[in-house]
Amino acid sequence: MTEAGSTDRLHHWLTGAAAVAKQAGQLILELYEEQAFETYHKDDESPVTSVDFAANRLIVDGLAALTPTIPILSEEGSHLAFAERQQWPRYWIVDPLDGTQEFIARSGDFGVIIALIENHQPVLGIIYWPPGDVLYTAQRGRGAFRTD
């Protein structure tokens, strides 16, 4: 694929993944405002909520529809061995609710993070902050942007 074709493909994926991040963020914000969630603890004793899992499902489904052949590595998903993951030429990394402790504490400091990795290098990045409806995006070769 030409460099221009690769850049256009990445931009298409960035646009789609940003829409998925915003959808997840809106779900997170609704449940935050309603205080409609349960809290659990992972094996490492860090907190996780039912909102983490709900946002994860939405994001994984959205990314799988956008890019069906690209694997997804999520903080709240299956934990595959590094030996397997290191062979992937391209994959998504997802933190469906970054700042779970802050979410629980109701500080408003939480967000959705999605990145696309190609050949062990980040090529796309998305951070969405639902309380302020602020979206940050970055694409290799095109720069980083904030959208309010």
Which residue ranges define each predicted feature?
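DPxDG-like acidic metal-binding loop motif
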Residues: R85-F145
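N-terminal subdomain of lithium-sensitive/metallo-dependent phosphomonoesterases centered on the IMPase/IPPase/PAP
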Residues: M1-L97
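Anionic-ligand binding region
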Residues: D148
